[in-house]
């Protein structure tokens, strides 16, 4: 990470896409995408996804590391080009507890991530706990971040400290996605970004963390990009001009969250304007969902009814029977909720792919299509971009390859933004 930031600060139009997903096919797609490029790949876990209690994936930080390393080994991707990050590490999961208890758990969370070899750590203590006022005083946020930083510094060995980096600050949306429709997005004011940096500098120095300050590489801000279930707010460079100018005077860059679904040109403009770390998550699993849905349509054309996976029906049954991950986010009317379940840009379906019934039906779908030849016309009908790549000779038409390449469509847009010589 430090090398990428140094090159950006030296004037190079370079950034990095942060892959925020625990889905094995998404991780495989990212590693295969940069297998021969020489680029580093940044894969991040969030605190609610992976923590010392298992998170919603059931994985502790060391488990997630081993999970990613296992995929890297299968792909042949060298570990030294892998960067593991932890996102929103702090009291996020324990906001309903008193601050003292939540911070104790947050310290253990940080220790678990650093001990497991995660080298990019987002120190986020911005959320109010059960006995806190709302919003929290910025100095309280910074002092709590310093407590977390101290835990990281005490856990890391000397070799780890060579690679250890911190990200501070937070964006407006809560981690995990918008629960309501967005009308507009407030771009972070440069005075607020400056205050974030200043309060953290004071708090770190109070705690004797002068050396750790040199490891702070980025500040999370809102540059004016967001999406909800049905709409996207696209980057408007002129609205973020003052914010973009301020960071030039510091040794840091910005980290932008919720950059999913922006255009290729927007990613290039964001990196140019010093939002050099671009986080993406739902857009990757949305592409995965599109691929599964497309393959299901092909299956309907090629496989007899009694042999089909029924994957789309199984997804509906599971999500309607177990609505915990989508109910409070999607519209209450039945017909509208079904559209959201299938096609919402926030892609709450991503929480259901590990479900045993859904996983088995996806496996059957792929097995069914592996046993037949996929006609080019059928691929053109349901996956036209992949058909073009087949025609160019850069893709072979297996179900697995089609899924991977569909996910990589998203990564191609980020590469355009993050790599100066990509046309």
Curated annotation (Swiss-Prot):
GO terms for biological process: D-tagatose 6-phosphate catabolic process; galactitol metabolic process; phosphoenolpyruvate-dependent sugar phosphotransferase system. InterPro entries: Aldolase_TIM, GatZ/KbaZ-like, GatZ_KbaZ_carbometab, TagBP_ald_GatZ. Keywords: Galactitol metabolism. Gene3D superfamilies: Aldolase class I, putative tagatose 6-phosphate kinase domain like. It comes from the Bacteria. GO terms for cellular component: plasma membrane. Belongs to the GatZ/KbaZ family. GatZ subfamily. HAMAP family: Tagatose_aldol_GatZ. This is D-tagatose-1,6-bisphosphate aldolase subunit GatZ. The lineage of its organism: Bacteria, Pseudomonadati, Pseudomonadota, Gammaproteobacteria, Enterobacterales. The gene is gatZ.
